[in-house]
Structure formats: C-alpha cells, structure tokens
C-alpha cells in the first residue's frame, strides 16, 4: 500500500519583465500544477494573454480544421525540431489552406453539377419510351400538346371518338402519353385524360431525342464523377504529404497557446506576477533550479507551510510502480484518492485480478483473452487502451492459476473423475482427480476442484475470501483514521469491527465444538466490540452490523457467476459433440454445423467471460471493499506543460 506522492505548495514571484521566461521554464519541465487565481481585494488581477495569443489561436483553429477535414489521426511519430516547424508554419499552412480551399470549392461546384445532371435525367426518364425530339413539343399556335402519365389504359378509339385530328404517342408499360390535338378539341380531350388519372409532366426545355440526351447526360455524369474522384485523390495525397507537418504544427501551436494564455490564470499587478501551485516534494528543488536558471535568479521561488484544510485540496499524483500503474485506471473510473488517504491501487492489483480469476477459472478462455489483449496492446497505439489491456492480462494470469486448480479448459475437465455412471475421462490422460478430505455437507474436497460438485464448499470459500477482503479494508480504514485522528479513534471506528468478527468466530467455534468457555468468551468479545463501535460511530455503528453479513455474502457471487460460465460452456460442448457423434459411433454429417456451433457458442461465452467476471469483481472492489475505508474525490495532478510526441526543442 502507498500514499499519493508528497506534494509541496509553492509560489513563484517576479517582475513582469521575466514572466515569459518563467512560463517557458515551467512549461518545459512539466512538473508544476498551477492553481487558477480568483480575483479578490488584494489588488492583484488576472492579466491578458501575450500579444501572439490571438494569432496562435487562429492558426491552431485553422490547422485543426484542416486536420479534421483530411481525417488525420495520431500515428507513429516522426519527431521534428519545433524551431523548424515554426519557421515553415506560415508558408506551408497558407499553401495548404489555399490548395485545399481551391480543390474543395471545385469539388463543391462539380457536385452541384452532378445534382443538376441528375435533375435533367429525372426529367427525361419518363419520356424514354417515346422517341420524339423535345423540339416537337412546343411552338404551335393551333395545336395543344398533352405530355404526362395516365393511370388507366388509353385506347386510340377513345381519342378518335372526339376528334380525327390527333397524333398519339403512348407506352402501355410506363403509361407515358404524348398527345397532339387541335386547340378546338383540347377541352374535351382533357376531360377524357382527367378521367384516366392524367398527371402532367414538365417537358425539358432543351431539344433532342430522349435516348440520345440520356446517353449524353450519363457520359457527362461519368466525366464529372471521375473529376471529383481525381480531386479527392489529390486531397488524399495532401494528407499523406502533410500529415507529419500538421501533427507537429498542432503540437507546437498547442504549446504556444498554453503559454500565451497562462496570464489569464495567474495573479498580476502593474509590475509583478505571482504563480501559485503545487509540485511533488521531490521535484521542488528542480523547479527552483530551472526557474532561477531561466531568469538569472530574478524570480523568487518558495514553498508554503501546509495547513490541514489545504492538504484536503492538494492535487493527487499517484505513487505506484509501472506494474501497478494500470490499476490507476480502475481507481480513476471510481474516484481518485484524496491526498490525505491511502491509495488502494496496490491492493486491487492483487484482489481484482484474483477475484476475476477465481470467477472465470478456465485455462482455455484465459489463453484466448490473454492472446487477444496482447494483440490489441501491440496493434493499438492509444495510451488509453494499453493500461486496460494490461489489466486484462493480469486477470488472465490469475485465471490460468485457478484454471489449473479447477482443471478446466473451455468447459472440459482436464482430469478424469469418478461419477455415478463410472469414470468420466479428462482431456489429459493419466491425470486423475484426488479426494483430499470430506468438506461441508458431505462434499468431497478434491484436486482439481470440481466447482459444480462442491457448491457448498465453494460458497464457504468465497465468503471466507470476502471476509479477508473486507478486513483488509478495515485495516486500511484504521490507517487513514489513525493518521488524522489518532489511534484511539482508529481502534473505536475500525478496530471494533475486527473485534466483533473475532467474537463471532470464537463463539461459533465454541458452539459447534461443544466448548462452552469459547462460546461465552466469544459472546463477551462480541459485546465489547459492539460497545467500542458505538463509542466510535454512535448509534449508526450497531445499526450497520447486519450489513457486514450482507457484504460477506455478496462474495458468494464468485461461485454463482463462475458456475454460470461452466454451464454455458458445458451446454455448448454437449450440443456440438452430440451433433458430431449422434450415435456415439461415427462422425455425423452435421460435423460442420457442430464446429460452427462450437465456435459461436464459445465465442459468445468468451465475451461474457470479459463482462460478467469483470463487472462482479469490480463491484466487490467498489461497493464492499471501498465501503470500509475509501472516500475518494481527489483532484488530478495536472502539471503545466505538454508531453511532446511529434516535436522536440
């Protein structure tokens, strides 16, 4: 167990003439967490950004807009000198902006042209079956032209009964109709067409035969599409060419922006500045040295004496080894520890994977999930993903350990065992189940441990693990309280719970062992523990006594969730092998289907093997374990600086 790194509150004071050098020095070392200044009656006020702040912000917005448009993502860094990036920035940024703007504008025009061509095509398509030049549809003084579609069937006899002077073009399939009649007969013909559900269509204004026009439009569409694709290809080549420059420029401008805007967070007067913040105590001397070097000793750096109230609000920097560090993700998911309390990362480094492994306990699933985690860790470069994959790997190590204890591989038993129907063979020849002793309810305790045959024993073991876990929490709570309120409070508030458990244990052993002295002694210890608890926590303490049993019984989920995984795997195996050997003598025709069932079934159970054990192991940490000692609510230590990836000084 460890506590967060010891922090020192420091103040940097100096003349405004050295503010920029001070900011540069603090940013470069990336070790100083700056507290935002809140204006008060002291006479100090927040200042304005540096003169280059607005220009830097505009360039940063532009470079990020370009990066977003091009779809540029983080990649394996090509480290460049920041000075070189800044020298080329204006030229390359303007060139890139002009080029992309020109190409995107052209693409936009071409896409509008495509939409126009599509609209022209939609106008022509209804007339495609009528091979008549559109010039013939207009320009008549004595003729009326009806162009559209009808719902019913149109016969020439219907027209000829009205007038003999007509010209009809009609397609029975598309119901398209073009009808030329004398204007004197137009009203009667219109009444006829209306009765057939006539719907007038717009006649294209251009001349030409529909089929030829359609061919021309499609050729034009293909040409425009090719030009668009060509321009998009050119833009994609810009992405390849300028990706490193854009990533490096974004980094350099982000750094310059941070520096330029820092005056908005610190106290300044007409001539002086004050920067207030925190640093790890081990880094304080380095900050003094770097700031003095950057300002030629003109800045004053000092540490402040901390009061208890200030410690409560100190930012928290974890103090864990590289191996334990991934568990900080689990801590941050819940809440970062306060500066004044224990950091349980080291504890859950053991307890979380252990409980996960105890639940899953299958070598086959552990190998699959472990391999998957290693592959993702290698392929995905994200700093957010790697710790999660490390946690998954830790869990699979414990899963393999328990898989050996349980003798399980994808739901199969590795060791042969005696059953009511005779000897059940295991996957490993010669490995037989050994009976060690008789356990709870007449169950035989064996090696390997067959969980489905030792349910009561496994429940008892799970609850025992829970009690150990809970008492570890009480010990951590004891340490936290002893540090802040003294041993007496720690003994009354947390030690009393352990004494109560001891009393119950002694009384139970005395009762079942027939030793009355133990029974009475246990009862006395229990009463003493309850009195101490009442003194420490008031009436709330005894009221919470039943919760201890509830917390302990919550750990029975270890065996419950584990058994569900076993039964799913066993069911998949039974179905698959029943399909392969339907009569237990020869392989059946459904072997391929059985293999699919086997793969899909175990694939689904593999996914569940991440979710179910993970969630339940996490719940036991957050609810049962943390509930005994942990408050959380700490602030993240966020130093002023930037972790460079694509540039260097």
From Swiss-Prot:
<dbReference type="GO" id="GO:0016471">
    <property type="term" value="C:vacuolar proton-transporting V-type ATPase complex"/>
</dbReference>
<feature type="transmembrane region" description="Helical">
    <location>
        <begin position="422"/>
        <end position="442"/>
    </location>
</feature>
<keyword id="KW-0375">Hydrogen ion transport</keyword>
<keyword id="KW-0812">Transmembrane</keyword>
<dbReference type="GO" id="GO:0046961">
    <property type="term" value="F:proton-transporting ATPase activity, rotational mechanism"/>
</dbReference>
<protein>
    <recommendedName>
        <fullName>A-type ATP synthase subunit I</fullName>
    </recommendedName>
</protein>
<dbReference type="GO" id="GO:0005886">
    <property type="term" value="C:plasma membrane"/>
</dbReference>
<feature type="transmembrane region" description="Helical">
    <location>
        <begin position="391"/>
        <end position="411"/>
    </location>
</feature>
<feature type="transmembrane region" description="Helical">
    <location>
        <begin position="458"/>
        <end position="478"/>
    </location>
</feature>
<feature type="transmembrane region" description="Helical">
    <location>
        <begin position="519"/>
        <end position="539"/>
    </location>
</feature>
<dbReference type="Pfam" id="PF01496">
    <property type="entry name" value="V_ATPase_I"/>
</dbReference>
<keyword id="KW-1133">Transmembrane helix</keyword>
<keyword id="KW-1003">Cell membrane</keyword>
<comment type="subunit">
    <text>Has multiple subunits, A(3), B(3), C, D, E, F, G, I and K(x); there may be a few other subunits as well.</text>
</comment>
<comment type="function">
    <text>Component of the A-type ATP synthase that produces ATP from ADP in the presence of a proton gradient across the membrane.</text>
</comment>
<keyword id="KW-0813">Transport</keyword>
<keyword id="KW-0406">Ion transport</keyword>
<comment type="similarity">
    <text>Belongs to the V-ATPase 116 kDa subunit family.</text>
</comment>
<dbReference type="InterPro" id="IPR002490">
    <property type="entry name" value="V-ATPase_116kDa_su"/>
</dbReference>
<dbReference type="GO" id="GO:0051117">
    <property type="term" value="F:ATPase binding"/>
</dbReference>
<feature type="transmembrane region" description="Helical">
    <location>
        <begin position="558"/>
        <end position="578"/>
    </location>
</feature>
<dbReference type="GO" id="GO:0007035">
    <property type="term" value="P:vacuolar acidification"/>
</dbReference>
<feature type="transmembrane region" description="Helical">
    <location>
        <begin position="592"/>
        <end position="612"/>
    </location>
</feature>
<feature type="transmembrane region" description="Helical">
    <location>
        <begin position="348"/>
        <end position="368"/>
    </location>
</feature>
<dbReference type="GO" id="GO:0033179">
    <property type="term" value="C:proton-transporting V-type ATPase, V0 domain"/>
</dbReference>
<keyword id="KW-0472">Membrane</keyword>
<feature type="transmembrane region" description="Helical">
    <location>
        <begin position="498"/>
        <end position="518"/>
    </location>
</feature>
